[in-house]
Amino acid sequence: MPTIQQLIRKPRQPKVKRSKSQHLEQCPQKRGVCTRVYTTTPKKPNSAMRKVAKVRLTNGYEVISYIPGESHNLQEHSVVLIRGGRVKDLPGVRYHILRGVLDTQGVKDRKQRRSKYGAKRPK
């Protein structure tokens, strides 16, 4: 416990809150180019082949981002837009790719929650 005199000399420093998606640099989204598109397996209780992509952002950072929805058209050199948001059962995946933007197509035959997957309104 510091004395009052010590607190006058050197006041308390507020704790620095770090962003959970630092490589976006305070932007809501960032553009990038896919350098590798692959599947990976989730942590212990879950089992699947999750689709992820390694993306080089316009600011030079390289991040791993998740491709949501069923099937995708991404390959190497596809230009994508990413947003923050981690995938709980994939370690190191802290970003999501936005569907229906730039080179990424929306999910086909999607009826509900279409805006999250870039799907057009069905006729």
Curated annotation (Swiss-Prot):
Gene Ontology cellular component annotations, sorted alphabetically: small ribosomal subunit
Keyword Ribosomal protein: yes
GO biological process: translation
Gene3D superfamilies in the record: Nucleic acid-binding proteins (2.40.50.140)
Xref: CDD domains: Ribosomal_S12 (cd03368)
Biased composition (Basic residues): 9-21
Pfam families named in the record: Ribosom_S12_S23 (PF00164)
Keyword annotations of the record: Methylation, Ribonucleoprotein, Ribosomal protein, RNA-binding, rRNA-binding, tRNA-binding
UniProt cross-references to InterPro entries, sorted A to Z: NA-bd_OB-fold (IPR012340), Ribosomal_uS12 (IPR006032), Ribosomal_uS12_bac (IPR005679)
GO molecular function, one term: tRNA binding
Modification type 3-methylthioaspartic acid: residues: D89
Region feature (Disordered): 1-28
Annotated HAMAP family: Ribosomal_uS12_B
Matches recorded under NCBIfam families: rpsL_bact
Binding partners and assembly: Part of the 30S ribosomal subunit. Contacts proteins S8 and S17. May interact with IF1 in the 30S initiation complex.
Function according to Swiss-Prot or TrEMBL: With S4 and S5 plays an important role in translational accuracy.
Family membership noted in the UniProt record: Belongs to the universal ribosomal protein uS12 family.
Protein name: Small ribosomal subunit protein uS12
Gene name per UniProt: rpsL
